[in-house]
C-alpha cells in the first residue's frame, strides 16, 4: 500500500500533523518495513501540490495541520474500497487500515479482495520451460497456496473496533540511555 493512500485514509478521521500521521499509519497498518518520518513529510508536500490535502491551521505548539480536500476525500474512499491487484502485503496493510477506521468501507474492500483472489486460469503455457514443466508447475502451486492463504485470512478476520486519532503527543527521538555505573 502506498504511503500516499495511507495518509489520505488516516486523514478521513480529521486534521492531523505530520508526526501524528506517521504514528497512526504505523499503528494501524502494522507495517512490516520501517517508515521514515521524512517520507511522511515529503509525501504530504506532494499531496498538497496535487490538491488532495490543504492546510488546516496549526497546533497550539505551531505544528502544521493537514486536512483532506474534496478530491482527497474521493481518492481516500476509492483506496479504502477498490483494490486493483491481489498483492499480499498491500492487502494486509489496506484491510487492517480499513478495519481501524469507522464506517462500512471495509466490507466493500474485503469483497473486492475476494474477487481478486478467486481462482483464475493459470498463466500461458506457451513459454518454453527448460525444466520440462516443473518450474511452471511449482509456480502454479505457489499461486494456488497464496490464493488459498489470502482467502483464508479474509475469512478469519477478527472484529476490530475502530479508533479515533490519538491526541496524546507521541515522544520523538531515542530513549534516554540508562546510567552506566563505573566499576568499583
Where do the PLM segments sit?
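A short small-residue
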Residues: 2, 95-97, 128-129
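Charged, low-complexity intrinsically disordered regulatory/assembly segments
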Residues: 104, 108-111, 117-184
Amino acid at each position: 500500500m502506498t504511503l500516499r493512500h495511507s495518509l489520505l485514509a488516516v486523514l478521513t478521521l480529521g486534521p492531523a500533523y505530520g508526526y501524528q500521521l506517521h504514528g497512526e499509519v504505523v499503528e494501524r497498518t502494522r507495517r512490516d518495513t520501517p517508515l521514515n518520518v521524512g517520507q511522511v513529510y515529503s509525501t504530504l508536500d506532494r499531496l498538497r501540490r496535487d490538491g488532495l490535502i490543504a492546510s488546516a491551521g496549526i497546533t497550539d505548539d505551531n505544528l502544521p495541520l493537514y486536512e483532506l480536500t474534496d478530491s482527497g476525500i474521493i481518492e481516500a474512499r476509492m483506496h479504502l474500497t477498490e483494490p486493483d491487484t491481489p498483492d499480499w502485503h498491500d492487502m494486509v496493510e489496506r484491510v487492517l487500515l480499513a478495519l481501524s477506521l469507522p464506517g462500512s468501507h471495509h466490507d466493500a474492500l474485503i469483497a473486492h479482495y475476494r474477487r481478486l483472489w478467486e481462482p483464475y486460469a493459470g498463466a500461458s503455457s506457451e513459454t518454453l520451460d527448460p525444466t520440462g514443466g516443473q518450474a511452471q508447475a511449482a509456480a502454479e502451486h505457489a499461486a494456488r497456496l497464496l490464493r488459498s492463504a489470502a482467502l483464508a485470512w479474509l475469512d478469519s478476520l477478527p472484529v476490530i473496533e475502530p479508533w479515533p486519532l490519538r491526541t496524546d503527543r507521541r515522544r520523538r527521538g531515542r530513549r534516554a540511555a540508562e546510567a552506566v555505573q563505573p566499576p568499583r
